């Protein structure tokens, strides 16, 4: 499924295609990023649970052009500095994601 879609999206000359490793709908089996890369000619961004080392490896191998860090950024406002320092990451509290108020937005510890 992702291969077919990625190939068809080439015609639209998108700025990038953002794919997630997780398959919530059970439609794609196996490695989504490799299939997308084989069929999509533009910039490919991956996401979903990457560690810094996995992101580096995927980019170095040409599998992805960039990796997005969603949940990791929510829990680590200083994520780039933590990655650079190889520091431990804060555990995210999913009960505070996208909720009103400051809890979960301004109270995570920084280095």
For the regions a protein language model found, what residue spans apply to each?
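Flavin-dependent oxidoreductase catalytic cores
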Residues: 1-111
């Amino acid at each position: 499924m992702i291969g077919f879609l990625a190939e068809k999206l080439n015609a639209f000359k998108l700025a990038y295609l953002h794919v997630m490793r997780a398959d919530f709908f059970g439609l794609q089996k196996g490695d989504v990023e490799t299939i997308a890369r084989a069929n999509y000619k533009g910039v490919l961004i991956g996401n979903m649970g990457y560690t810094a080392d996995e992101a580096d490896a995927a980019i170095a191998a040409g599998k992805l052009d960039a990796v997005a860090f969603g949940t990791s950024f929510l829990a680590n406002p200083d994520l780039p500095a933590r990655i650079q320092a190889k520091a431990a990451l804060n555990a995210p509290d999913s009960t505070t994601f996208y909720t009103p108020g400051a809890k979960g937005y301004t109270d995570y510890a920084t280095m």
